[in-house]
Amino acid sequence: MIEVVLDTETTGLSTTQKHRIVEIGCIELENQIPTNKVFHEYLNPQRPVSEEAYKVHGYSDEFLADKKTFTEIAESFINFIDGKRIIIHNADFDLSFLNYEFRLINKPEINRKNVIDTL
């Protein structure tokens, strides 16, 4: 079985306040063993990082300014996770942001039934 362990960092805690993803990191596992396939991107959120989020991840607006946008990496991210079970700690948080980003660009959302939450 192929799985992807996924984590995100964001500009804040809520998509209702239009916070965005600033980092996506994934590793692929086959039968729980890393395959050395990795997806990692820092993202330009096109909005300021909140002070609280900066204290968590340390990514400044200046650092993120020249990074790709979610729109620019969406297809490669979709291809990386496609058909794989996704493992996320606190999945509700990460999925709310990932699916918010997908809605903004009219892409299908990640189906919760394909996700294992470690929380």
Describe each PLM feature range.
Residues 1-114:
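Conserved non-catalytic scaffold segment of RNase H-like nuclease domains
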Residues 116-119:
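Short, flexible loop segments at boundaries between secondary-structure elements
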